């Protein structure tokens, strides 16, 4: 189960040479770190850059989640990356953000069962996020709030206000992510 004292290891590809597998082992030995977070657009290094390979391989080996900031067409490389690493859990943060990004995220999730969609910033697209629930397995939908940059009450209120039965929303709030964490090795 996700605990408040757990966080993602933020992998910056500009330091890929220094972040060896041994360094990752040292970090992930501590239960504080539960997966990776990547922000390709912040670092101006696209996800298909080979400097991310260590993340894909390490997450595959240890069945870790990888939360990626995705916006617009930014997630396109996962069309080929995700199938190569079936035990890694690729979480498309913001479900692509824009309308085009949301459509691409859904398309990618339909192609690869290890791609998950994150609710955070659902207000950035005119395409209703709840409609995803009818198109992919709900166990691959995750609630996220971007705690800090976004108002968590607003994000949660928007999520709970969707015209979806509570019994279908509840697992998205925590159970689905808890299942991902339970699979780590």
Task: Identify the residue ranges that each predicted region occupies.
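Secondary-structure boundary/capping residues
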Residues: 4-7, 90, 141, 168
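Mid-to-C-terminal alpha-helical segments outside catalytic/metal-binding sites
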Residues: 138-140, 149, 153-185
